[in-house]
Amino acid sequence: MSEYKPRIADGILREKLEAIGAVLVEGPKACGKTTTAEQQAKSVLYMNDPMRRMQYMQMVETDINTLLDGAVPRLIDEWQTAPQFWDAIRFTVDHRDGDGQFILTGSAVPVINNGQIEHTGTGRFGWVKMRPMSLWESGESNGGVSLSELFESPESIGATSTLSLSQLA
């Protein structure tokens, strides 16, 4: 397995965990949600584990709190396969002391108030939106040009790149 490359989202996730009970990390498939969350999680539940998936789904229906037990922050990966996690985590956050209890990751987010999720999560959940790695995160750019600087003062931007156009594409 390759070495973890730090992401901009690492700091954002850390800040959210220090401020709220649960954090939902969302974004497209394969953008690094699980890997990023694993860096800060103290325990992990992989809902898509083929050897345990059926057992986990039965536990969701009979004793979901057992699945929530573990060192915090506890990562629930692919949580959307069992939307019941949302209300169970909201309830747990309300009745435990402390921020940074849960990290939820998944590519799809169920609709609130669809019969499976009863509460919006306001005040209990924070969100981190992830995107695929930027060129700077992947090491393909030195960060000499930033989009925010480009919009703030386009006349003062000046940098060169060793990458060819085909390498950037």
What name fits each language-model region?
Residues 44-73:
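Short glycine-rich substrate-engagement loop in P-loop NTPases that contacts/grips substrate
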Residues 114-169:
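Interdomain motor-coupling "hinge/lid" segment immediately C-terminal to the ATP-binding subdomain
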Residues 1-14:
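N-terminal pre-Walker A segment at the start of P-loop NTPase domains
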Residues 86-110, 118-119:
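Conserved catalytic/switch belt of AAA+ P-loop NTPases
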Residues 75-76, 101-107, 129, 138:
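Structural recognition of the conserved hydrophobic beta-strand(s) that form the central parallel beta-sheet
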Residues 25:
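Hydrophobic anchor at the beta1->P-loop junction of P-loop NTPases
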Residues 33-34:
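Conserved lysine of the Walker
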